[in-house]
Structure formats: structure tokens, C-alpha cells
């Protein structure tokens, strides 16, 4: 009797949240370059709204202790290697960056540089940014917003977590991290493991090297904190009237501290003991009706202070008398982008340490002034940053500016810039222009890309995906794997889901925001609009910011897309036809009629007429006749959760079996039906093998083994080999295994062999070992190679081709092998009654 043994590799991630924020907007977005940034204020806000919507409860909140409790649960889970091996390969991109809010040059070594990514952790360069290495991937949180050295030594470092620049609570960070070994290892300061430190937006260190351990922190809890013992304890020195986002200590007079908030600026002249409100709105003071305020002292003039205020699309204010009076230096330049502006999101200001009249301010692009802000000259143009910065400019959306450690205004005016595209450098900040003088430092080995989704050709020759503010990217090879640096960025803006024509890999599909489907006929070199007839496209009231579409696994000319309605094309997206109407609407916070939107789609592999869809309000429906009739299945058998549907997976081998996942911090995020939705079972696991309470983003069947299920969450990938009755997380056998502590946005297969995890912060990972189909026949001669034509004779022979920890499943039938097979001291298999289990 012939039997098939299936070997598979999978690593389980141990991940942490990207700090998120909730914003509400409903304006349309155009995909033309000039209009993208005019509407960037809208879609930057929509990005946070989209990310928050699936995670928040009915009150728009995520539990502040949700991350901690989920991690504690994972620590208690049994450790095993269910449903596969443990190894992954990082496949990039390493030449396309992601959002950076922290840059830290080493004052003792100008070649040494650290950056903090908002979802990719801390990275280090020892050659001025030419190459980068991730630091301590498995620390508590990778949402880095600020970094400083201890005043006394650069061997002690502090990193803030939690990106809190929005209007209301998002997902929590993990307080403040500290390293005492020059950044090699990082640990959470226990004193910051509480709700007051869930968003730590900025750190500042006392400038005196004799003041060891004195650090300041500002948070979204409206607090200004100070520690004098290196973070063992913190004292709230002041409670602000709004979220505190920036803090600076005067390098010449450390008793003077300035704090920028959302709409407020506060100044202290006594080390933070007392504070004055500089935004009182009275004569000679700052206005009281502004937005986010970024602040800076002038090292060459202790009486001079600058503020970049999110007001009137960008205002620069200056004080020449240490805050006694203030003067408006510039307004109307519109450096925060089109109305209403996005200074709440990207806002930064830097002053030349040598000359207090020379400044650079950043919003969407960068502007330079040599007269104290009265005149601004644009020095970067986001449209000229393309394909990893090859066109020589800075990426859009500026978050941080800092001079090089060996900066000299005359002989070495080198300055670094952190933005949504990573980090760029101007060797001469006083001569750099829109498209001249820029060096992209995120173009070789900085892997912090934020994917929403992706797809792979069956042979792996093309892998595509959509990124936050770095749009549609593509890996392409003509043969063997050519490395994570071989990615190409076709366009700019925000990307989303992706698909590849499996019969003709020159035909690719991607999207711009709000369901604007794009098509490439040249393997991703360029894209064109492909949403004719799709009337939901481009309207935030009708489609999600990142809206779902799916290619038919039976015919690549067929695709299905979802907005308020469901749409289908049968001619390679040349035009679209509605196959389901809207299911309902509501009045949103702006008073507009907004429709419930499709959030996920799956199509049966064996029958194109069978389509399942899920919605933001928990509605789940199916059709068996390509949309002529639809049946709601979420109310059957007691009903599914009334929450955002994050994903649907139809068993490719049996269309009656379907998994549906839901967003939020709940213990019922994974559901299974064995009979096409007639009955439902909560498959979040059985104690002690149950899943933690956390966000589930994606679910996939193994193509060759329907018992094996994989989910991607905000805390990693979990696997089950019994259809979700029990779940496992892999143990740490040999150091840090697998992808790092960042969110898995989507799981997808490369053919039937490799599982790929698209992460929102560290690019893509792919399982190192493909599932191999091995044949065993007890009547075969010894010496087979495991192929169908030349099978192995025994399970023992077959096991020799599998790696350590492999799981072997034998198809139905009886097998008489009883020999115990050792797997490199990491477990063994026992064959009993035709089944094989890991012990």
C-alpha cells in the first residue's frame, strides 16, 4: 500500500504591538502624485483609523493591559512544534525602508548610529548608515519612538515605545526600555510597566555627564516624567492639558526645559519643578488654538527658542528672550501638506548648533531657512524619492532631524532625517536641494517595511506586496533566490493587498487606498488603473482604507473585490460588475452616511461560484452561484461574534470546511464550520492549549493537510494540527527562532511548499523548509528516493530526509513499522496503528 508522508516547516513568532491611534475622516483620495500629498493628511489619519477599527471594542478602545496579559498567556502555553518545523528565512525587502521616529548618533564615534523604527525595533550601523544590523529582535516591544544615551555614559541607553501622535488611545507600547551594554540587550523598566507609559513619545537626557541617570519622558497620559536613578523610579513633574509629544533640555542651561504638546507649550526654568503655559493666547504669547507643537532650544543662543506648530498648515514661532515673548516667523508656506494639514503626524524642527538663525523644518517635505524661519526654501520633494531613493531626494513625512556626531557647520554640515521611508542623509544641509545632495541610508540592509498584504508566484520567481507609504513592491528573480536587496518599488503612496496571475506572472494586481485596483502587465515595473465600473473605488464612505480583493484560484482572469458592495471581474480587471449590493449604513462621527464595508474575501479552490465575504460589522455571507443569491451564515447556530471579520479561509480540499477570524481582544476570535456555515464551533483552543486573548489578522489552511491551520496575530503565528482544537507556540531551543517581535498582517503560500508571513514592521519571512511529499511502500526495494516512482521502503528511511522536530502524517491505511526513529535528540517518532506522533 502506498502512503504519502508530509513534512512541513513553520516557526511560531513571539511578537508585539505597533502602537496605533484612532482618527476619523471620510474624504476621498486621488492617486495622482500631486494629489496624494494634498490628501496625505486624510489618508495618514485613515491609516490609523483602519488599523484601529478591527482591534477596538465597542467603545473604540483596546484594553491597556491586553498586550501584557497575552504575553503572560503565551508563556504558560505548552511548547511544541506542531504542524511543522521552526525555521524561517527573512526575504526582505532590505532596500525599501519604513517609518523611523528616532535617530541616535554616538557622540564618541561618528561612524556609529542607531535608529528606532515604529514597528521594526532598534537597528545599529557602525559605518555611518551604509549597512544596518537589528539589535535584540526579541525585546519587549519594537514600536520605538525615541532614544537617548545616559548623561554619564553611552554604554547606557534608553528607548521609548508607543507611537502616540493621534487623537485618542490606540494600542499600548511597553513603557521605556533600557540597555546597560551599549545596546546589545534591552529590558523593560519595571517602573514604566503601567498605563501612564503606554505611549512614550519623546525622551530627553540631562546634558551634564556628572548627572548620571537623569532622564525626562513625555507621554500621552499628559505627563512630564523625570527619573534621577536611571529609571528605577519616575516622578510626574507636571500634568499637561493635552498629550505631551516633545521635550527638550537646554544644553547650556539644563535647568531650562521646554515641552511641546497637542495645542500647548510649557516652559520650566527650575529643572521641571514649576511650569509656565506659553500658549495662553494673550499678546506676545503663543496662540492657544494650535495643534501639535514641536520645540527646540538653540545651542548657540540660550535665549532663543523655536516652535513648529500645527496651525494654518504650518507656523514657525520664535522667542528671543527665553519665552518671555514670542513672534510668528512664518505661516502660509504649507509645509504640513494640503488642508487640513498633517502636522499632527509629521512635524519636526532642527536648528544649526552653530547659528541660531539657520533652521530646517519638516512636514510632508523639508524646508530650510537662514533667516530664523521668515523665508523657507524647499530642499526635498517626495515625488523625487522613488525606488529606494534612487532619484535622489528625501522620502515623504518627516519625523526627526539630528546632526551627525561630528557635525561642523562649515567643514562637515552632515544631517540625518527620519521619515516614512526610513533614513536619509544630507552631507551638506546648506546646499542640498530637491533632487541633489541626498543619500538614502535605507537602501541596502534596513529591513523595517510595513506590509499590509502580499502574494507569491508558485515558483517564487515573483513576490509582491503593498506597504504603508511605500506602495507596491516586487521581488523578482530568474532562478535561485537573489537576496532581500532585490526588491523594486513601482510607485509611491500606500499599497495594500496583491495578487499574481499564476498562469502568467507578468500580470500582477495591487491597489491604492479605498479599493483603487491597479494592474501591471510587465511583472510590476509599472501599474495602471484597473477599476472601471467599480463605483466604490476611491470613496472612504464606501470602501476600507485597505480594501480586500482576491484572485479566483480556478481562473486567474477572475477577481472579486469588496467595498460597500461586492464586485467581480471575468476579464482580468478590465471592467467590474456588481454581484452584491450594500448591506447597510450608519451615521458616522462626522455626520455622514457611511456604509458597512467588506473586510475579507475567499473563493473556493474547486468552484468559482462559491464565494465567502466578511464585513466590518460581523456579517458573514456566502454565495454558491457567483452572487445571484447570498446567504448570511453568521447568525446560524447561536451566531458568530458581532465584530470586525479579519479573514476567511475555505479548505482547499473541502469547501464545506471554513475558518473565520474576528478582530479584537477576545477569547473567541477563531471559528470553524464543518458544514458551510450551518453550524459553528469556537476554535480558539482548549485549555491549556488555547490561544491568548489578542488580535487575529489572518488564517490559512495547509494546502496539503487540512488538519493543519495557521493564524497570524499581533503577537505572532500560531499553529494547530487538529483544526484549532489545540494551538501551540514553539519553544526557544537554540536562541531566537524566527521572525521578530512585530505584527503578522497576512499569511500566504508560495505554491504548496512555502508559507510566507508578511509583517507590518519587518518585511516578509518565508519558511526555510518546504513541505515535501514523501512516498513509502513496504513492498518497495530498499534504497528508494521517496518519489512516487521510487518510494522509501520504511518510515525510518523517510524520516532521514526530514529535519529535527518534523511532524509526519500518514494517510489512511495500516502501517506495520514499529521502529523508534531518533531526530537529533530533539524528539522521536513512534509508529502505532498507522499513525505517527512526535514525543
Task: Describe the predicted segments one by one.
Residues 309, 811-812:
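Structural motif
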Amino acid at each position: 500500500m502506498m502512503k504519502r508522508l508530509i513534512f512541513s516547516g513553520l516557526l511560531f513568532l513571539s511578537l508585539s504591538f505597533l502602537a496605533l491611534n484612532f482618527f476619523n475622516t471620510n474624504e476621498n483620495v486621488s492617486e495622482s502624485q500631486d494629489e496624494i500629498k494634498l490628501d496625505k493628511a486624510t489618508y495618514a489619519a485613515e491609516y490609523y483609523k483602519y488599523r484601529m477599527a478591527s482591534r477596538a471594542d465597542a467603545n473604540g478602545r483596546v484594553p491597556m493591559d491586553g498586550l501584557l496579559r497575552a504575553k503572560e498567556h503565551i508563556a504558560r502555553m505548552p511548547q511544541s512544534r506542531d504542524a511543522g518545523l521552526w525555521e524561517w528565512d527573512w526575504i526582505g525587502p532590505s532596500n525599501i525602508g519604513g517609518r523611523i521616529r528616532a535617530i541616535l548618533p554616538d557622540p564618541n564615534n561618528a561612524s556609529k548610529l542607531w535608529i528606532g523604527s515604529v514597528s521594526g525595533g532598534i537597528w545599529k550601523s557602525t559605518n555611518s548608515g551604509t549597512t544596518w544590523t537589528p539589535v535584540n529582535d526579541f525585546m519587549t516591544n519594537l514600536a520605538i519612538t525615541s532614544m537617548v544615551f545616559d548623561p554619564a555614559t553611552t554604554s547606557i541607553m534608553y528607548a521609548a515605545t508607543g507611537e502616540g501622535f493621534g487623537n485618542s488611545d490606540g494600542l499600548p507600547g511597553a513603557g521605556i526600555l533600557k540597555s546597560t551594554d551599549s545596546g546589545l540587550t534591552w529590558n523593560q523598566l519595571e517602573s514604566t510597566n503601567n498605563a501612564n507609559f503606554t505611549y512614550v513619545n519623546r525622551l530627553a537626557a540631562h546634558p551634564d555627564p556628572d548627572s548620571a541617570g537623569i532622564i525626562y519622558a513625555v507621554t500621552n497620559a499628559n505627563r512630564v516624567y523625570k527619573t534621577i536613578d536611571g529609571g528605577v523610579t519616575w516622578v510626574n513633574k507636571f500634568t499637561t492639558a493635552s498629550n505631551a509629544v516633545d521635550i527638550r533640555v537646554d544644553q547650556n542651561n539644563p535647568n531650562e526645559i521646554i515641552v511641546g504638546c497637542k495645542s500647548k507649550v510649557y516652559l520650566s526654568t527650575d529643572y521641571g519643578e514649576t511650569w509656565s503655559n506659553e500658549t495662553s493666547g494673550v499678546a506676545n504669547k503663543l496662540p492657544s488654538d494650535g495643534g501639535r507643537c514641536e520645540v527646540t532650544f538653540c545651542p548657540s543662543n540660550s535665549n532663543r527658542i523655536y516652535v513648529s506648530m500645527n496651525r494654518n498648515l504650518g507656523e514657525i514661532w520664535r522667542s528671543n528672550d527665553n519665552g518671555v515673548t514670542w513672534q510668528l516667523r512664518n505661516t502660509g508656506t504649507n509645509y504640513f501638506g494640503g488642508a487640513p494639514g498633517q502636522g499632527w503626524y509629521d512635524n519636526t524642527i532642527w536648528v544649526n548648533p552653530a547659528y541660531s538663525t539657520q533652521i530646517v523644518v519638516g512636514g510632508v517635505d523639508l524646508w530650510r531657512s537662514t533667516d530664523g524661519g521668515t523665508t523657507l526654501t524647499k530642499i526635498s520633494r517626495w515625488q523625487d524619492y522613488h525606488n529606494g531613493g534612487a532619484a535622489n531626494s528625501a522620502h515623504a513625512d518627516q519625523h526627526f532631524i539630528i546632526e551627525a556626531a561630528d557635525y561642523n557647520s562649515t567643514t562637515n554640515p552632515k544631517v540625518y532625517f527620519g521619515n516614512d521611508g526610513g533614513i536619509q542623509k544630507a552631507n551638506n544641509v546648506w546646499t542640498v536641494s530637491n533632487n541633489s545632495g541626498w543619500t538614502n541610508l535605507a537602501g541596502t540592509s534596513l529591513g523595517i517595511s510595513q506590509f499590509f498584504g502580499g502574494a507569491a508566484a508558485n515558483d517564487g520567481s515573483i513576490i509582491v506586496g503593498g506597504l504603508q507609504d511605500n506602495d507596491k513592491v516586487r521581488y523578482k528573480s530568474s532562478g535561485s533566490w537573489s537576496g532581500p536587496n532585490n526588491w523594486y518599488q513601482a510607485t509611491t503612496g500606500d499599497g495594500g493587498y496583491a495578487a499574481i496571475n499564476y498562469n502568467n506572472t507578468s500580470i500582477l494586481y495591487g491597489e491604492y487606498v479605498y479599493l483603487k485596483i491597479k494592474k501591471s502587465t510587465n511583472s510590476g515595473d509599472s501599474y495602471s488603473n484597473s477599476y472601471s465600473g467599480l463605483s466604490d473605488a476611491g470613496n472612504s464612505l464606501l470602501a476600507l482604507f485597505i480594501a480586500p480583493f482576491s484572485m479566483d484560484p480556478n481562473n486567474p482572469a477572475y477577481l472579486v473585490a469588496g467595498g460597500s458592495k461586492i464586485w467581480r471581474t471575468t476579464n482580468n480587471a478590465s471592467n467590474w460588475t456588481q454581484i452584491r449590493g450594500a448591506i447597510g449604513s450608519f451615521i458616522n462621527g462626522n455626520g455622514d452616511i457611511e456604509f458597512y464595508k467588506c473586510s475579507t474575501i475567499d473563493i473556493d479552490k474547486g468552484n468559482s461560484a462559491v464565494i465567502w465575504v466578511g464585513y466590518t460589522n460581523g456579517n458573514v455571507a456566502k454565495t454558491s452561484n457567483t452572487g445571484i443569491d447570498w446567504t448570511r451564515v453568521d447568525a446560524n447556530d447561536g451566531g458568530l461574534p458581532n465584530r470586525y471579520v479579519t479573514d476567511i479561509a475555505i479548505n482547499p480540499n473541502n469547501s464545506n470546511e471554513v475558518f473565520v477570524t474576528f478582530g479584537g481582544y477576545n477569547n473567541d476570535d477563531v471559528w470553524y464550520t464543518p458544514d458551510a456555515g450551518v453550524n459553528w464551533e469556537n476554535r480558539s483552543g482548549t485549555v491549556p492549549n488555547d490561544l491568548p486573548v489578542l488580535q487575529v489578522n489572518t488564517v490559512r489552511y495547509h494546502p496539503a493537510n487540512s488538519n493543519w491551520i495557521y493564524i497570524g496575530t499581533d503577537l505572532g503565528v500560531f499553529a494547530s494540527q487538529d483544526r484549532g482544537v489545540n494551538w501551540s507556540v514553539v519553544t526557544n531551543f537554540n536562541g531566537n527562532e524566527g521572525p521578530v517581535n512585530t505584527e503578522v498582517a497576512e499569511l500566504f503560500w508560495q505554491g504548496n511548499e512555502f508559507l510566507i508571513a508578511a509583517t507590518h514592521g519587518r518585511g516578509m519571512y518565508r519558511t526555510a523548509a518546504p513541505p515535501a511529499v514523501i512516498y513509502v511502500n513496504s513492498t518497495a526495494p530498499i534504497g528508494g528516493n521517496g518519489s512516487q516512482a521510487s518510494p522509501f521502503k520504511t518510515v525510518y528511511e523517510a524520516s532521514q530526509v526530514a529535519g529535527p522536530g518534523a511532524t509526519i502524517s500518514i494517510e489512511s491505511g495500516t502501517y506495520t513499522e514499529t521502529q523508534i526513529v531518533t531526530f537529533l535528540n530533539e524528539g522521536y517518532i513512534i509508529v502505532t496503528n498507522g499513525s505517527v506522533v512526535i514525543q
